[in-house]
């Protein structure tokens, strides 16, 4: 089932999206730290056996990768798509008074205020033009 959102519904869904996004962002940062530690251990050139430490880091990195995949799946269950994870950018299929659109939310934004015409999701996002009530 393909879900589409009005702009109002997309903004209401942000409460849940932000919770999922916070976990994804935290996992992204932790994974990056672990990967740096792994690189440092690998390049240490010490005679001690570091295989155990490397295996432990690999296991922790894998856990973060799995959790990130789970976060993406939760967003996909809502009908949304993760365009990229840094910065976290989420596409929300939508409908406006002029037809189908793709709303675009990026980490740190307070509301859904950017979008793309359908079929132009890879292009630079554009500010949404919202008509004032009564206009």
How would you label these PLM feature ranges?
Residues 5, 9, 42, 60, ...:
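Sparse, context-dependent recognition of short Cys/His-centered cofactor- or disulfide-binding micro-motifs
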Residues 1-44:
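Long, hydrophobic N-terminal alpha-helical segment
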Residues 20, 25, 61, 90-92:
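Weak global preference for isoleucine
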Residues 8-11, 55, 66-69:
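Generic alpha-helical secondary structure signal
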Residues 21, 28, 65-68, 72:
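A structural signal for well-ordered alpha-helices, especially hydrophobic packing surfaces
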Residues 33-65:
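Structured domain cores in non-transmembrane regions
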Residues 69-135:
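Glycine-rich, aromatic-bearing surface loops/beta-hairpins
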Residues 3, 7, 17, 47, ...:
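A near-ubiquitous, low-amplitude feature marking generic local secondary-structure context
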């Amino acid at each position: 089932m393909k879900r589409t959102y009005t702009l109002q519904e997309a903004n209401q869904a942000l409460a849940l999206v932000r919770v999922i996004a916070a976990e994804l962002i935290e996992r992204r940062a932790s994974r990056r730290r672990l990967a740096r530690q792994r690189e440092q251990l690998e390049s240490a050139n010490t005679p001690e056996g570091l295989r155990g430490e490397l295996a432990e880091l690999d296991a922790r990195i894998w856990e973060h990768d799995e959790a990130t995949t789970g976060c993406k799946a939760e967003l996909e269950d809502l009908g949304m798509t993760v365009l990229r994870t840094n910065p976290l950018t989420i596409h929300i299929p939508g409908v406006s008074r002029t037809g189908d659109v793709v709303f675009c939310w990026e980490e740190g934004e307070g509301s859904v205020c950017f979008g793309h015409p359908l079929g132009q999701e890879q292009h630079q996002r554009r500010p949404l033009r919202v008509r004032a009530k009564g206009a």
